[in-house]
Amino acid sequence: MMKANFIVVEGLEGAGKSTAIKTVLDTLKQAGIENIVNTREPGGTPLAEKMRALVKEEHEGEELKDMTELLLLYAARVQLVENVIKPALANGQWVVGDRHDLSSQAYQGGGRQIDASLMKNLRDTTLGDFKPAFTLYMDIDPRIGLERARGRGELDRIEKMDISFFERTRERYLEIANADPSIVVINAEQSIEEVSRDIQDALNEWLSRQ
């Protein structure tokens, strides 16, 4: 019997993460894995959701500094990992996450251009060697992704960043993904059917090796 694993879906705004997560859940269930916990970052616990709101919302009269944003994200992540993800895995439940640490490495390390050694030290200090077993990165041109995101309604504080921010974020995502065999890059600019097929193929191939 396969041990419970932590699977994450990553991507820029408008990359289709919600649809990808549904495909992941369906594929796992088809493989006989029914006991699954869903998480999202930032958030996923009552306290972490409050931190999510602080990161996402505009703060009239006060700028949220990049370092404050980064520390809030890691504080929320620790709450989620320690209070939800690790207990679920220990209980034999699979966990499917909407974002995890790779988001911070890409958005704050790449987009915000925060020092790489600081990013690594913060990750190592807060998470240790904890990481997802398998990650699907939904890759999309930021212009296409933001167009899709705008179609959903009002943009949040981070979604309002300029295009160069998202280009740097995407570049960092791809840089990390290309160096880590546990991360699979999915072309999210394809049709929903093609994207779903690629996700199913990648996930089933990974499951066959567990």
From Swiss-Prot:
Binding annotation for ATP: G11, L12, E13, G14, A15, G16, K17, S18
Keyword Calcium attached: no
InterPro entries: P-loop_NTPase, Thymidylate_kin-like_dom, Thymidylate_kin_CS, Thymidylate_kinase
Entry superkingdom: Bacteria
Signal sequence segment: none
PANTHER family associated with the record: THYMIDYLATE KINASE, UMP-CMP KINASE 2, MITOCHONDRIAL
NCBIfam families the record matches: DTMP_kinase
Function: Phosphorylation of dTMP to form dTDP in both de novo and salvage pathways of dTTP synthesis.
Name of the protein in question: Thymidylate kinase
Native species: Vibrio parahaemolyticus serotype O3:K6 (strain RIMD 2210633)
Gene symbol of the encoding locus: tmk
